[in-house]
Curated annotation (Swiss-Prot):
Has three domains with a flexible linker between the domains II and III and assumes an 'L' shape. Domain III is highly mobile and contacts RuvB. GO terms for molecular function: ATP binding; four-way junction DNA binding; four-way junction helicase activity. SUPFAM superfamilies: DNA helicase RuvA subunit, C-terminal domain (SSF46929), Nucleic acid-binding proteins (SSF50249), RuvA domain 2-like (SSF47781). InterPro entries: DNA_helicase_Holl-junc_RuvA_I, NA-bd_OB-fold, RuvA, RuvA_2-like, RuvA_C, RuvA_C_sf. GO terms for cellular component: cytoplasm; Holliday junction helicase complex; Holliday junction resolvase complex. This is Holliday junction branch migration complex subunit RuvA. The keyword Cytoplasm applies.
Length: 205
């Protein structure tokens, strides 16, 4: 199995790139985001590779980051999501944006991807909620802070608030989404108690 390619961009197409590695050209299927991030022909590139083997062919799927590849694998585990749809989602949403959409139950953001209707978007959000690593989901959900301004890191009160809600019996994904929503309503100095209180209000809606 091929896990990584390091070489030169030979050529690109609508959904593929040919990477020259030591004189051998590898045809790699890519999302639109990956293609946008590739250097021009002749430029050096390293791609994380997911190898798909079928009776007809061996297919290489390329990603500019390991995170994108991991998300691709998660998406393929969702009922009704194949390679084309998964790449469509990753072409529309960066890993952090996808994690945020799932943590905040934002089906509309997911359905913006080509080939993803409301039902598939709902399945993606529902089936992946508990599969997103805790730190990834919380960090992504809180990345956009008050008034939409980015924050550099997740505060200790936010982490404590999520832990408290989980201890109260709420699922991890719901707790993260509630605290993220509460954090957007409060200022950066919000205490754990404030985040818990407002988080509970979000969960009661």
């Amino acid at each position: 199995m091929i896990g990584k390619l390091r070489g030169i961009v030979d050529s690109t197409g609508e959904d593929w790139a040919v990477i020259d590695v030591g004189g051998v050209g590898y045809h790699v299927t890519c999302s639109s985001r990956t293609l946008r991030n590739l250097p021009p022909a002749g430029g050096a590139v390293t791609l994380s590779i997911e190898t798909k083997v079928s009776d007809e062919a061996i297919r290489l799927i390329g990603f500019t980051t390991d995170s994108e590849r991991e998300w691709f694998r998660l998406l393929l585990a969702v009922q009704g999501v194949g390679t084309r749809v998964a790449l469509g989602v990753l072409g529309t949403l960066a890993p952090a944006d996808l994690a945020r959409a799932i943590a905040l139950d934002d089906k509309k953001a997911v359905s913006a991807a080509p080939g993803v209707g409301p039902k598939v978007a709902a399945r993606i959000v529902t089936e992946l909620k508990d599969k997103v690593p805790d730190s990834m989901g919380l960090s992504a959900a809180l990345e956009v802070g008050v008034n939409g301004e980015a924050v550099s890191s997740v505060s200790a009160p936010a982490r404590d608030a999520v832990s408290a809600l989980v201890n109260l019996g709420y699922p991890q994904a719901q707790a993260m989404g509630a605290v993220a929503a509460a954090a957007k309503r409060l200022d950066d100095a919000a205490s754990t108690e404030q985040l818990i209180r407002h988080g509970l209000k979000e969960l009661a809606r």
